[in-house]
Amino acid sequence: VYDNFIQASRIAEHKDVRLPIMICQDGFITSHAVENIELLEDDKVKAFVGEYNPEQYLLNPKMPMAVGPYATSPFYMESKMNQNEAMKNAKQVILDVADDFAKISGRQYGFFEEYKLEDADYAIVMIGSAAGTTKEAIDALRAQGKKVGLLKLRVFRPFPGEEIAKALAHTKAVAILDRSEGFRAGGGPLSAEIKEHLYDIGASTKAVSYIYGLGGRDYTTVEATDVFNQLEEMIEQGKTIPQYQYIGLRK
């Protein structure tokens, strides 16, 4: 969260983007926890973020402009198209800013983090702090000789769909874990995005949708292990499993 906040201003204020940006953190689970972090010196952060120099100022008699009014139908679609172009531009800006941040911090970021994914047959895809729990389960399963891995998403918008699909294309099956309900009777928002892009590149990877941790409910290594076992049984034994299910429901 700390590192992402430092990068956020540079991304949002870039002349090719100029869009709002949100940094999301697991409420209570990490926001009320105590953990060591490595802070950067203030002067380094200030130099990295820099000063915002707008291309146009609010009061300019030579170029009068309106800021903040709603767009009516003659202009609305064009404004939406411009926002979409800015969102496309944001992908490269995010990577460029991350490269610059790595130079002052030694910490490199991309659209997502891969954990033991390069040779994995089965993978979990998720966002947020629960990835740490999944990593513990992966380490234990790897010790048993099982090829499992994790893809932890860092950037949700613009969605790096093609990059994620290519990173997962070699796997036999993936479990997509959403900590939010999409209310479409078929999985959460992350699930919908990833399945679409796996289809687009023609990947043979099977994808199963899961919902977990709603309302801050705990997610355990036992549950992560069970998800991996379900994927393996589906592929290796031909077992039919629900393609959309909740983890950790009270019976």
Language model: regions and residue ranges:
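Redox- and metal-dependent alpha/beta enzyme cores, enriched for Fe-S-associated oxidoreductases
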Residues: 118-146, 159-166
